[in-house]
């Protein structure tokens, strides 16, 4: 408060008037209320403390896992869209600046912006086409490798098939030759006839298979005729083998039994004459032993020859059969590999067809984008031309009527 100065009073010393200064009255003391203190009805401070309003119900609620997941997804979407939002904000700021400048500038910048967006979309489509083209080229390279493997397997299958045919023909011819020898020598006529029949059936089976490969016999007929001929060939081979081994064993037993019976009868006859003439008995025993030795030697020689012939024929058949079985197994393995490679090749062709369809679709979309971009640019040019015509008409009107 400023002091009040008056000139009404004078001093007795000089008689001149001196200014009178009034001092302000002291202000009454007031007690300040501290935040949080409550007064009662008499004006005193209450000691109950601060009374706050009850919290809202939303404060006591807890966030569930679903809400947390939604918030997380929202944050991720915001993060992903940050770059796009920045790009859009830049475009919007540019458009806003040119909007405030002039309509013509805005239209020009709008056309440039649309053109840039179309170029970006076109670049994306071209990148997709290039990526799919690279994948297609990789598939083509894989298919070429598969084709080479298939060709090599086909050559190996052809070679193994030729080897199997050679062994098959050799087995059939050997069976016919050995059977003919057995029939001609009289060692085993029945078994030899069976071997000849088995060889003939084998050659017929090979001829039928060759005709089927050449296309002279249909596949449906071969499905029925092939197993029948094979079964007949196997049956005749088994029968001829059993008869060969069985005939040799029975013939050996019969020869041995006959020779033993003859020797026993000779010894009994010479023993009855022993009481008459000792010299004659000695001579008869020596003659009988010599005759028995001669006959047994001839019999064993015949048995050895027949056994050698049959053993040789059977060994030849076994060797040829083993070779034929090995070549047939190799041929089946090569054919299985060839079928596997053909399946892989067909799968790769299907993948290539799918990729080609995707590339064709992208090309169509790219052409549609080019057409839409051209339409938008034509529309913008029409708008600019229409505005130019309108301004020209306005400029050509008279100022006064």
Curated annotation (Swiss-Prot):
This is Type 3 secretion system translocon protein SctE. Residues 129-160, 345-379 form a coiled coil. The chain crosses the membrane at residues 176-196, 224-244. It comes from the Bacteria. Keywords: Coiled coil, Host membrane, Membrane, Plasmid, Secreted, Transmembrane, Transmembrane helix, Virulence. It is found in: Secreted; Host membrane. Belongs to the SctE/SipB/YopB family. One of its GO terms (cellular component) is host cell membrane. The gene is sctE. Disruption phenotype: The mutant strain displays a wild-type phenotype with respect to in vitro Yop regulation and secretion but it cannot translocate YopE and YopH into the target cell cytoplasm, fails to elicit a cytotoxic response in cultured HeLa cells and is unable to inhibit phagocytosis by macrophage-like J774 cells. Additionally, the mutant is avirulent in the mouse model. The yopBD mutant can secrete YopH at the same level as the wild-type strain in vivo but is unable to translocate YopH into the cytosol of HeLa cells. It comes from Yersinia pseudotuberculosis serotype I (strain IP32953). Pfam families: SseC. InterPro entries: BipB-like_C. Component of the type III secretion system (T3SS), also called injectisome, which is used to inject bacterial effector proteins into eukaryotic host cells. YopB/SctE and YopD/SctB are inserted into the host membrane where they form a pore and allow the translocation of effector proteins into the cytosol of target cells. Is an essential virulence determinant. Required for YopE and YopH translocation. Shows membrane disruptive activity in vitro. Interaction with the host cell triggers a signaling response, via activation of the small GTPase Ras, the MAPK kinases ERK and JNK and the nuclear factor NF-kappa-B pathways, and production of the proinflammatory cytokine interleukin-8 (IL-8). YopB/SctE-dependent signaling response is counteracted by YopE, YopH and YopJ in infected host cells. YopB/SctE is directly responsible for signaling and its insertion in the membrane is important to activate the signaling response in the host cell. It is a multi-pass membrane protein. The core secretion machinery of the T3SS is composed of approximately 20 different proteins, including cytoplasmic components, a base, an export apparatus and a needle. This subunit is involved in the formation of a pore, called the translocon, in host membrane. Interacts with YopD/SctB. Together with YopD/SctB, forms a multimeric integral membrane complex.
